[in-house]
């Protein structure tokens, strides 16, 4: 399920120090976009485009948008503010070289860290606002266009399943997922096990817990999007 964030209107500028930011909705390349014209006036600081947006957030999600621009190398920050306005989550892309042509950007929820607020952590449950911030690196002045902002629900809906080349009674492939363990038959010269997530998922890592009584052995870990390779 994908929810499209409303178009390039209703964004408000926030700046620090003497920095300047002008926001305007434009049509470019057949797309409605938010245009950010910024000028750090030879100093540091930040400029922010902020929009109020109330929405229940899925447990796992991805934020996608298209980006292009021109200007010096600076940091781009994406911030999510909860409905209280006090808790903030942030993704920082440091030293961003603005692409002259439209580039699709994708930020997974696991890469959006809790930044500050009284909740002291956890995930965002109800969105209250969204911010795109340009934080001075080289500073200078330039223009950024942002379009097609979407929130994609990536919460798994199906349980993973497992299959194996063989198994002894009581230690079938499913045991690898349930914690009881998987054991191939002694005569299985080339044992293998496949764990299928059924639907696309972001995999942060894999922990292999070797059963205490199992003899030491080498193994390979392979990954595939469709199981064909």
Where are these regions (language model features)?
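Disordered, acidic Ser/Thr/Pro-rich linker "stalks" and the adjacent N-terminal cap
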Residues: 3-4, 11-13, 17, 24-32, ...
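Extracellular ligand-binding interfaces
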Residues: 38-118, 139-145, 150, 207-229
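Short, surface-exposed loop and linker segments with low hydrophobicity and enrichment for Pro/Ser/Thr
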Residues: 22-31, 67, 117-129, 199
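Extracellular glycan-associated modules
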Residues: 7-13, 119-129, 140-143, 193
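Hydrophobic/aromatic beta-strand segments within beta-rich folds
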Residues: 63-65, 107, 127-135, 191-209, ...
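N-terminal, post-signal-peptide region of Sec/Tat-exported proteins
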Residues: 34-36
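Short loop/turn motifs at secondary-structure junctions
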Residues: 101, 123-126, 145, 202
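Solvent-exposed, conformationally flexible loop/turn segments
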Residues: 1-6, 58, 98-102, 179-180
